[in-house]
Structure formats: structure tokens, C-alpha cells
Amino acid sequence: MASRRRSRELALQFLFSYDLNAAGAGDFDAWMEDFCARFNLSEKNFPHFFTLAQGVKNRWEKLNDLLAESSEHWKLSRMSGVDRNVMRIAIFEMLYCDDVPPRVAINEAIEIGKKYGTDESGAFINGVLDRINKELGGSEADLPENMNTTNSKE
């Protein structure tokens, strides 16, 4: 598995757990230390994992605002925790990781959402992130070339 994909999956697991259990109430650094010890992150995966986890946490409200504005008829609380956190990671990468093209962030989010989310996650994540990409000034060229958002859970 590619190092960046694994880092994103670990960030999803961390943020999902943090979101459900400690967001706003717990010590982020202690939560991070416990997670890293429990999952024994490799030196290869840690840098991008940490960038994503810390970056999403530091921009939590901004990312939530973008999600809320771009997901018509869906409150954040109604979204699956997996979908919500996959999209936070992708939006963070689209905004703050210059080395990650928007189409890569979107495609990775779709694939990870299909793997860990529901049958509808890929299509839902694609729709919301496509809207956000357009709002941020992205174009069709920024979207994944082959968006296979069928309802399969690879």
C-alpha cells in the first residue's frame, strides 16, 4: 500500500476516534500520543499522517464550515463519521498541501470512503468535494479522470 494512502487511512482512523470521543474536550497531544503508540506508526507514514491530523484539527471550524456550506440538505451531525472525516482530510489537502493536486485528494477520499464507509459514501464524497473544488476555483481538469463511484466496497 502506498505510504500516502496509508497515512490518510491512519489520519481517518485518528480523526474519526477524536471526533467521536474527544473533539473539544480532550487533550489533542495526549490523544495523538496514545494513538501513535497503539498503532505503532512507521517513520515512513508518520510525517504525512501528522500533517493531516494536526492540520485538520487546527482548521476544524473552517473545514466544518466548508462542509456545511457545500453539502446541501445535510447537517454535519447527519453525515457518517467516516464520510465527514474523509472529506475534512481531502479539503485540508486541497487547501494546504501544495504537493497534492485537488484531483488526487478527491480520488483518494472517494477510494478511502468506499473502503471504510457505506455503499453510498463514494458518490456522496465525490459530490460534496466536487462542489467544494468548484467553489475554490478548481476546474473539471482538477477532478479525477475516472471517477468510479459505483456502489461497490472494494
From Swiss-Prot:
Gene Ontology MF terms: RNA binding
Pfam families per UniProt: NusB (PF01029)
Signal peptide boundaries: none
Keywords in alphabetical order: RNA-binding, Transcription, Transcription antitermination, Transcription regulation
InterPro entries: NusB-like_sf, NusB_fam, NusB_RsmB_TIM44
GO cellular component: cytosol
GO BP: DNA-templated transcription termination; transcription antitermination
HAMAP family: NusB
NCBIfam families recorded: nusB (TIGR01951)
Family: Belongs to the NusB family.
Annotated function: Involved in transcription antitermination. Required for transcription of ribosomal RNA (rRNA) genes. Binds specifically to the boxA antiterminator sequence of the ribosomal RNA (rrn) operons.
PANTHER family reported for this sequence: ANTITERMINATION NUSB DOMAIN-CONTAINING PROTEIN, N UTILIZATION SUBSTANCE PROTEIN B-RELATED
Protein name per the record: Transcription antitermination protein NusB
Organism name: Desulfosudis oleivorans (strain DSM 6200 / JCM 39069 / Hxd3) (Desulfococcus oleovorans)
Lineage of producing organism: Bacteria, Pseudomonadati, Thermodesulfobacteriota, Desulfobacteria, Desulfobacterales
